[in-house]
Amino acid sequence: VVLYTRNERIFTNARFVVETLGECKPGECMVCIADAATYGYARVMCDVARELGLSAMIIDIDCYGGDERYMKLPVMEPLRQAILHADLVFMLTDQMLTDFGMFLGNPDECDTALLGHSRCFTFEATGMEAWQLDPQRILDDRARTLRLYKKLQSARTLTITTARGTDLTCDVTRADAMYPVMAIIPFYAEVALIPGLGSVNGTVIADGASECAYGQRGEPIRPAQAGNMELWKKPMGLHFRDSLLIGWDGDAVQAARLDKLMEDVDPAPRLCDEIGLVTATSVENDRWGWRIDGSHQTRCVHVAIGNNYRRGEVIHAPEHVDFDVHEPTITLDGTVICENGVFTDAV
């Protein structure tokens, strides 16, 4: 919990989030959704909002849920109405325990929020008092995200390779959808490509973390959490043919976790549901963000398995697991746009 003191760095960082990323206007109403771990950050956000001429309030949902219990709770209509009627909303609670789909009673609202259409932001506030925030870097990353999104719309072939053996090809002309994801703020951004069925072939060597499985919010398959770090183990190989996961190998314990996921979930999450091209470059994303599983790092792509049979409508199906691939070389129609995790001038 942050001690509520007048730390100028935290106020400067909060102002950038509210004013620049939130694009607030005087007279608007702002809501922060917080719990015990994030309430101090929410207080700072509201103080900044008032200085900018907004009306602001905090909804503390700690007594409503807390920890894993959030996932099993029904929709609370007062919270739902507050979100629907606010001009902008910042969710400061952990995004792997809460999301706007849960609060609003419609799972599709999770993806709507991630795209920024509703001005409902997933705000990773942890460490805000210590961030060495570089506003221009963040804005440049967001601009690159839009440029890459535009390039993909007219692209034909996407190839991802790594020194550790990843060699994956996607026929982009058959993609069901693609989205610029820029509402997980302040540091994160990506372009999410939803590949068409039958369009992905090759091998992914997942040497990074895996996201907590959506249907099993417990142990990640490849955890990278404080006190539970398994990235030193053999990377996991994921083998795709025509967008179907046909096999996997790696550390025996981690492979057994994936075996169990396939057994427990119906329909089994054997589809290549997403290729996430991470455009964020701020080191703060890796230090302060995604702490629940250590995934979604910079200088990565992630490849998701899942059971999305509504392709073109949603990014995240009932089951969805991202696997990070470090230091990728990304080639688009023969042009290298990212080399060993670093974007080139081509994008």
Predicted features by range, described:
Residues 1-234, 241, 331-347:
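Active-site bordering "gate/hinge" segments
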Residues 14, 194, 265-267, 293, ...:
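Homeobox/homeodomain signature
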Residues 203-205, 237-239, 247, 302-304:
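Structured core elements
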Residues 231-232, 247-314:
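Dual-mode signal for accessory low-complexity, basic/Gly-rich regions
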Residues 233-235, 325-326:
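Short loop/turn microsegments at loop-to-beta-strand junctions
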Residues 288-340, 344-347:
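Internal helix-turn-beta structural module
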